[in-house]
Swiss-Prot record:
Protein name: Chaperone protein ClpB
SMART domains linked to this entry: AAA, ClpB_D2-small
Region (NBD1) residue spans: 160-341
Role played: Part of a stress-induced multi-chaperone system, it is involved in the recovery of the cell from heat-induced damage, in cooperation with DnaK, DnaJ and GrpE. Acts before DnaK, in the processing of protein aggregates. Protein binding stimulates the ATPase activity; ATP hydrolysis unfolds the denatured protein aggregates, which probably helps expose new hydrophobic binding sites on the surface of ClpB-bound aggregates, contributing to the solubilization and refolding of denatured protein aggregates by DnaK.
Amino acid sequence: MNIEKYTERVRGFIQSAQTFALSSGNQQFTPEHILKVLIDDDEGLAASLVERAGGRVGDVRMGLQSALEKLPKVSGGNDQLYLSQPLAKVFSLAEELASKAGDSFVTVERLLTALAMEKSAKTSEILSAAGVTPTALNRVINDMRKGRTADSASAESNYDALKKYARDLTEDARAGKLDPVIGRDEEIRRTIQVLSRRTKNNPVLIGEPGVGKTAIAEGLALRIVNGDVPESLKDKQLMALDMGALIAGAKYRGEFEERLKAVLSEVQTAAGQIILFIDEMHTLVGAGKTDGAMDASNLLKPALARGELHCVGATTLEEYRKYVEKDAALARRFQPVFVDEPTVEDTISILRGLKEKYEQHHKVRVSDSALVAAAMLSNRYITDRFLPDKAIDLVDEAASRLRMQVDSKPEELDEIDRRIMQLKIEREALKVETDAASKDRLQRIEKELSDLEEESAELTAKWQAEKQKLGLAADLKRQLEEARNALAIAQRNGEFQKAGELAYGTIPQLEKQLADAESQENKGSLLEETVTPDHVAQVISRWTGIPVDRMLEGEREKLLRMEDEIGKRVVGQGEAVQAISKAVRRARAGLQDPNRPIGSFIFLGPTGVGKTELTKALASFLFQDDTAMVRIDMSEFMEKHSVSRLIGAPPGYVGYEEGGVLTEAVRRRPYQVILFDEIEKAHPDVFNVLLQVLDDGRLTDGQGHTVDFRNTVIIMTSNLGAEYLVNLGENDDVETVRDDVMGVVRASFRPEFLNRVDEIILFHRLRREDMGAIVDIQMQRLQYLLSDRKITLQLEDDAREWLANKGYDPAYGARPLKRVIQKEVQDPLAERILLGDILDGSLVKITAGSDRLNFRPISGAFSAAEPEREDEKA
């Protein structure tokens, strides 16, 4: 016996059989040991051959058990194993059988045949008793081999290659495992047309990710099963190749190629009956490529060109261009079929077709309006993905969220149960008390507990009943789907009696039961059982941060009072606050142009009048966070080449992979305020980039991604024309100098840029009477800083007036006041705190002196109400 003539699998089995013999205490290595490890193998090649040859695997195992128990056992021996005469004959016969069949290696099936043929071996008797004959085994082996010989040490891994490395889509379609494919008739027809050609009959489905390329292949499988295809494709098998399984575990050089050749050989042997579907077709290029080895695409080319291999590929536009088009010889063997993104209307039809599958899976109902909302909202707000995939995901997640709520305890019941627990704890504490008041309280608690427990039991029963009702509806849907699948199979197989029973008996009965179950509307139901547009909108809001869900009463009031809220932070600029508020209200009411940003404004005015502060106040109002905005200081973009910092460097330049400051921020958070500060400082070319943003609400970054700006508020600030605004009188209207200011603005910016901005807002200089309110705002901020030390500031009216007068400078706005407060309030306070004059928890009264402020600390008078953080008010 030459062990090198045996395949790796057989060598492994011989080794396992030796280990088994030693562990059993047998000194002789017999055929029974070999058959035992062959039959118990996980992959089950031997067991499968026995079954296919008409044998009973259970009987083989029982016979083996009996034979192995009769073998002589030795304990305390020297672990020496001797080859028995029958096993030597079995090995010799296996080598002879392999040689006659033209095999270079002895394989598992040849060894099994030898075990059945060798009369001196007990295994022949066992297999014969279980109904296995050598003739039947040879017939099954020839069917499995399909004329191939064992030319390598890993020959067994190539048997039934299609079963191992491909999935039968037509079989899945027959079993009803595939989702229905709605629409896409044109693409499926075009695919069938290419498949019906004589040569190069290989379509490749090319389209963006998520448009339904794989669904078209599944649609083709469904059509083949239903017989809705031309004669040339009738009864064909559509097999989806699993590239991962092909490559996985191919350790040795040439093993991957061997597996792929085995797959191709099976497809070719089927004489055109098998169509191979290769999803992510670009993975063929370079798959299995090592030094000197051929990759998968080169192995496929000859068969593709001759028309021996029917193949349907699917890949994205980008990957087709990147991998397949570079290999012209591979590209010419495929005929492209372009798959476009479906329209919103088509997506709604697709969702309606899939609705039942999702209802059955999540055990909730999905309203038709939720499907319409999913298609429309995903199309509008999720711009970096494609229909129908993103709409299907929305419905799936909305149904999943609702199912979680159904499985959780209802809020009403949860509150009662918590109250019961609280009262039980109180009752136990009162039981040890002996006074009359405690006894009285105990009686009241007992009564309340009994009422609450009764209510809890009632609500729990109601909740369980509602859950059960939902489960029943889902169960009926599943039975209905199974019945419809059975009807389709019966019609295909010509079993008309069974089809009649299903079509006119079982299915109508199930439909009636389902309609009855769904029509029982529960008044005052504890559970929400239907996915509505609101649920879909909530999911969109979670994904993108864009508030598309229905406004709650509180938010409506807040939006209507927006001017007052922002006015608490921005003083004296009523027109600007009003313009911003109107834009936000338009957007939240759904009345803004869907293809433009929520609002785009240029704020013009002298320094320190609140241009940047208004932007911060808006961000704080919308997101409860001052920092929820992208602030871009345009003084950093003075050179022409700095444009690439906004949108990302083009290919070939350093920093290409990093993306742009502006585009990356908006891609990550599509709903936010964007502030371009001091816009006149930027290079004129920067404004060219903004033209598309202001007009169409989109911008293409350096990597070719389209970034959506339709949910942003764009604010640009500038000091242009400030000299006219500064010289205005206290009570003069800003409109009187608008023409002068606009003249300066037009000289700096191009008409096409100014024409795209929604509104140019002029900020007038601050009036003297505005200063008091600004002092209050600044002092509030200082108070917030001191809140950790529990120090309360009490600013008297005279001190307030003193600060307002000293900090007022019409040319510089509110910034001088900030400096005055720093010098006259913060500096003295800091010194007094460090000296220990002002202790933690003190109240400090601030009054005005002749040339400075006076601070009078009153110890231990800290105000219990912690000061409200100023930016939380907005």
